[in-house]
């Protein structure tokens, strides 16, 4: 038996299984040991069944796959070779686990006899991602001692676990040499594939799993609770689950606090600012019940309110993981939000508290005055809706800017907003944005901090592959301006936290052959955007701002609103 031929047969069954579980994208890094998997992915692409994406940097590739999976809402597979290539996927795997995004990571490996004996590029890869995968499959070296149906069943079981608890599946695949020179004729004719030939021809899963989605039942005491004073908080959710939330809350007369990641147009915007007012916060704490939809709230003051609330607490979230860092005694509904809303009809009532509405309206004009008419970080966040296309998507990085947007912006209803707020790292943000833009095939605006952009600068190469107008804003405040919020001595903060880099991005962008602009005014920006939206390519727009301008405005807003007196 030719080892190279059977390596391909083994890989064929692996990839055919994944395609039947919904995988339509394979993200591939260069490497020799992963050759059998890579060649099978190419075969699937040649038959127009999948799309292959490539990148030379495994860390960026993992985050690119994460972006694809976020926007497609289907599992995306990643193929890498052995050694530290596999280790470089770890940050993306952590983020996928924390946010319930489905990745299937295929790590090629050396065979067992080459592990822990000094062989080149050989590390211990089984369970290398610890508990972050929802399922780990450590395959043996390809061998006819294992039937093809065993291999299919083993992989399908892992995918079924992923369907029940979204996250990462890790499949470690050792291959012995030789890895090359296997003819397609020999692969197709191999006797090991004969028992599954019907399955190969039908393009259906081996095991027909029946979904166990249960009908959402009305809470036994809903007729009581819907007459009470309530607050809903809406966090990170798929757009399709958010339809009807605000109409439901408004009918109930309940207060609604919405995170920018929810894609819900806030009826009480700027909550991160007006919740700094202790008088209004204390009145809000008089609510009888809080219902949390989704998770991952950005606002510090929303999180402080939730931590202080001690009455009835419900959580509605499709996933099964814990999503309450305040550890309330609560009622949990494992359900899609729109299904839960249908099962819990609202009762029409007048608003039970008017001060939040009055303070929110006051904030709208107050913020406008404070951010001013200049093009700066705060005004860009406040007027973010001005720069978005009608049919596009938005990605927000993990800098000070995402907090400013959550606090100061009011985005259109249902506008798709994506973030990496699971572990909230600054790694892989450009790569994630590229995956979202290419996966959505819509105009993309990505807002990234300067340090985040420098950290992931390799991923600018991915933006050469876009086919829609793509705009990357780099907010360059010369270092980690978010650390200006810390109570640390100024000289220590500057040297050990902010770490000014004194770099600009014009030359870096030229290296990657992307368009570049640096507007100084809103009029400049308008002209730049008009051109950028007319091109099916990437434009990087650098906004240079003072190191502490935005944090100063932000802190001033919080301080002044905290003393505001608003009557009913």
From Swiss-Prot:
Recorded metabolic or biological pathway in which this protein acts: Quinol/quinone metabolism; 1,4-dihydroxy-2-naphthoate biosynthesis; 1,4-dihydroxy-2-naphthoate from chorismate: step 2/7; Quinol/quinone metabolism; menaquinone biosynthesis
Enzyme class, spelled out: transferase
Assigned EC number: 2.2.1.9
Single GO molecular function: magnesium ion binding
GO annotation terms (biological process): menaquinone biosynthetic process
Required cofactor(s): Mg(2+); Mn(2+); thiamine diphosphate
Pfam families given in the database record: TPP_enzyme_C, TPP_enzyme_M_2, TPP_enzyme_N
Family: Belongs to the TPP enzyme family. MenD subfamily.
Matching HAMAP family: MenD
Protein name per Swiss-Prot or TrEMBL: 2-succinyl-5-enolpyruvyl-6-hydroxy-3-cyclohexene-1-carboxylate synthase
Gene coding for it: menD
């Amino acid at each position: 038996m030719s080892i190279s031929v059977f390596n391909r047969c083994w890989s064929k069954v692996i990839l055919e299984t994944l395609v039947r579980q919904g995988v339509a994208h394979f993200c591939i890094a260069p490497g020799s040991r992963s050759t059998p998997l890579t060649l099978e992915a190419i075969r699937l692409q040649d038959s127009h069944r999948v799309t292959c994406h490539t990148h030379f940097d495994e860390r960026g590739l993992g985050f690119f796959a994460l972006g694809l999976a976020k926007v497609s809402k289907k599992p995306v597979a990643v193929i890498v070779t052995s050694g530290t290539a596999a280790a470089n996927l770890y940050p993306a795997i952590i983020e996928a686990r924390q946010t319930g995004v489905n990745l299937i990571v295929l790590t090629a490996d050396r065979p067992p006899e080459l592990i822990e004996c000094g062989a080149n590029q050989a590390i211990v890869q089984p369970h290398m991602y610890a508990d972050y995968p929802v399922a780990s499959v450590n395959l043996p070296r390809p061998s006819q001692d294992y039937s093809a149906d065993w291999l299919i069943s083993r992989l399908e079981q892992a995918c079924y676990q992923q369907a029940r608890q979204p996250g990462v599946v890790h499949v470690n695949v050792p291959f012995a040499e030789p890895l090359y020179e296997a003819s397609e004729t020999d692969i197709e004719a191999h006797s090991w594939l004969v028992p599954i030939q019907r399955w190969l021809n039908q393009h259906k899963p081996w095991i027909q799993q029946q979904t166990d989605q249960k009908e959402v039942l009305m809470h036994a005491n809903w007729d009581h609770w819907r007459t009470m004073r309530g607050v809903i908080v809406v966090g990170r959710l798929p757009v399709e689950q958010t339809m009807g939330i605000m109409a439901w809350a408004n009918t109930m007369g309940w207060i609604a606090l919405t995170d920018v990641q929810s894609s819900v147009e806030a009826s009480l915007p700027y909550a991160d600012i007006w919740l700094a007012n202790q008088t209004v916060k204390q009145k809000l704490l008089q609510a009888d019940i809080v219902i949390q939809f989704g998770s991952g709230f950005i606002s510090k003051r929303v999180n402080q309110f939730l931590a202080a609330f001690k009455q009835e607490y419900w959580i509605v979230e499709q996933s099964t993981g814990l999503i309450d860092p305040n550890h309330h005694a609560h009622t949990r509904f494992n359900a899609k939000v729109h299904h839960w809303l249908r099962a819990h009809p609202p009762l029409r009532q007048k608003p039970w508290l008017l001060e939040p509405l009055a303070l929110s309206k006051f904030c709208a004009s107050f913020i406008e005055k404070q951010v001013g008419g200049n093009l700066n970080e705060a005004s860009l966040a406040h007027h973010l809706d001005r720069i978005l296309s009608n049919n596009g998507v938005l990605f927000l990085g993990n800098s000070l800017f995402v907090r400013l947007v959550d606090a100061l912006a009011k985005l259109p209803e249902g506008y798709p907003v994506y973030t990496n707020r699971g572990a909230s790292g600054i790694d892989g943000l450009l790569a994630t944005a590229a995956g979202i833009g290419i996966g959505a095939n819509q105009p993309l605006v990505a807002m990234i901090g300067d340090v985040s952009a420098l950290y992931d600068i390799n991923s600018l190469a991915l933006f050469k592959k876009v086919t829609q107008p793509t705009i990357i804003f780099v907010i360059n405040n010369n270092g980690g301006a978010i650390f200006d919020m810390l109570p640390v001595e100024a000289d220590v903060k500057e040297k050990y936290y902010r770490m000014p880099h004194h770099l600009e991005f014009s030359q870096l962008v030229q290296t990657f052959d992307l368009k570049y602009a640096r507007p100084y005014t809103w009029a400049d920006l308008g002209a730049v955007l008009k051109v950028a939206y007319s091109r099916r390519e990437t434009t990087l727009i650098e906004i240079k701002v003072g190191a502490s301008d935005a944090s100063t405005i932000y802190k001033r807003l919080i301080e002044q609103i905290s003393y505001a007196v608003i009557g009913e």
